[in-house]
């Protein structure tokens, strides 16, 4: 990275590495970040921070540099977890993350350390999706530390004006202005202005259809899909059922509802997905995905049958894998306006469909989802709200939700 050898693969990282004012701190942090792994287990960052001081004092490193290295060793998992499991457009997430990084220089070093750590874990551990998530978190955190306004009328209006300047079709300006005002504010912050224009153009073309799916971008082997459909309870489960049927794996999802000029409530959802093959294969699946989703919306197909139709595997073809302990965490502290549900379990086809169905069956709405897979272990994270649009604060309801999710996973384990 510092030599620029990986500029084609990691342009942002190479630029930042070339501008590093204190490379010694980063090099020592990279060398020592896992020094506590054999001794500390789950708490190896804490143990590693202690041991790194011993090593660096023996080497005669300056006290100020030792403190910085210790901090990076202690926090070396933090950026990866936030990037792959949290909504980086939530101001509370950014506030808490940037409080951990010791300023803009600390952010730069933590980003480079995280990139080096993930990339060297195994040949396939760094994917283009993970790289994109890390890059986006770095840019958002840098903007936050630089004092850019996080949210509010001023920033919202600035984004709208930037987007409107890109809109070329004056005949449909009324539709576009309504589109911008009808979607929730977080949509404006979570998407690039050019992406918003693409979404609006697609939403206009899809007005007459109950469901439409379009490829937005391809970054082999990943594909970004936009789904515009008539909104209804359980729509996300229907969409993920079609993905499961086509053997597409979802890595992130943004879920938005808006009311069109004709009074219909529409959903605009953005997904990052991949198949087991190159991106072009997933592109060819889009017409079939549309047909399946239209059938589900019309009530002509059953979501469970669609989701499980391609799931059967001969027992002899399923290779044994290490067991993965299932954990369900329900968190009301990590997000400004949503309850965060984090499900860690063994990965399996259709898992997102079953989890989203379970969550929506108890009356909760999913606004955002992020899925991070590491080998056979998956962390599915959902940002949810109750019927009134707020957090789930009732402890009995939280326990019921946790119980239902665990029950769903137990049934999957039992083959039911």
Residue ranges and their predicted role:
Residues 1-30, 35, 219, 322, ...:
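Active-site-adjacent "gating/activation" loops or surface patches in catalytic cores
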Residues 92, 96-416:
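Regulatory modules associated with amino-acid/nitrogen control
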Residues 11-16, 66, 70, 87, ...:
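Residue-level signal for alpha-helical context at structural boundaries
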Residues 16-147:
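Divalent metal-dependent catalytic cores for phosphoryl transfer on phosphate-bearing substrates
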Residues 5, 56, 62-66, 81, ...:
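Conserved catalytic alpha/beta cores of large enzymes that bind or transform nucleotide phosphates
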């Amino acid at each position: 990275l510092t030599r620029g050898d990986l500029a084609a693969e990691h342009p942002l990282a190479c630029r930042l590495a070339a501008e590093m004012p204190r490379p010694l701190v980063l090099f020592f942090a990279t060398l020592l970040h896992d020094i506590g792994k054999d001794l500390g287990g789950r708490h190896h960052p804490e143990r590693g921070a202690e041991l790194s001081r011993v090593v660096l004092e023996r080497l005669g490193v300056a006290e100020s540099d030792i403190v910085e290295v210790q901090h990076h060793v202690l926090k070396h998992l933090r950026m990866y977890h936030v990037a792959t499991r949290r909504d980086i457009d939530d101001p509370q997430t950014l506030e808490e993350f940037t409080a951990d990084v010791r300023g803009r220089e600390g952010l730069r070093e933590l980003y480079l350390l995280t990139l080096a750590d993930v990339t060297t874990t195994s040949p396939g551990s760094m994917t283009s999706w993970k790289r994109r998530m890390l890059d986006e978190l770095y840019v958002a955190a840098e903007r936050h530390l630089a004092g850019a306004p996080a949210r509010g009328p001023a920033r919202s209006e600035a984004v709208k004006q930037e987007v409107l300047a890109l809109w070329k079709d004056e005949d449909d300006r009324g539709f576009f202005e309504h589109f911008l005002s009808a979607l929730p504010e977080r949509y404006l912050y979570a998407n690039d202005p050019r992406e918003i224009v693409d979404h609006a153009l697609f939403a206009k073309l899809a007005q007459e259809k109950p469901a439409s799916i379009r490829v937005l971008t391809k970054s082999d082997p990943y594909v970004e899909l936009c789904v515009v459909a008539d909104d209804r309870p359980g729509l996300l489960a229907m969409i993920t059922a079609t993905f499961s049927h086509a053997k597409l794996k979802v890595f992130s999802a943004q879920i938005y509802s808006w009311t069109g000029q004709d009074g219909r409530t529409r959903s605009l959802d953005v997904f990052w997905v991949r198949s087991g093959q190159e991106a072009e294969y997933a592109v060819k699946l889009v017409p079939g995905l549309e047909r399946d989703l239209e059938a589900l919306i019309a009530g002509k197909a059953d979501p469970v049958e669609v989701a499980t139709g391609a799931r059967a595997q001969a027992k002899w073809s399923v290779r044994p894998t290490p067991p993965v302990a299932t954990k369900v965490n329900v968190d009301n502290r990590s997000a400004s306006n949503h309850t965060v549900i984090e499900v860690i379990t063994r990965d399996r086809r259709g898992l997102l469909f079953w989890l989203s169905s379970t969550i929506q069956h108890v009356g909760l709405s999913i606004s955002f989802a992020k899925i991070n897979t590491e080998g056979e272990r998956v962390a599915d994270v959902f940002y949810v709200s109750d019927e009134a649009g707020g957090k789930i604060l009732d402890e009995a309801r939280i326990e019921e939700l946790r119980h239902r999710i665990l029950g769903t996973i137990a049934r999957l384990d039992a083959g039911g």
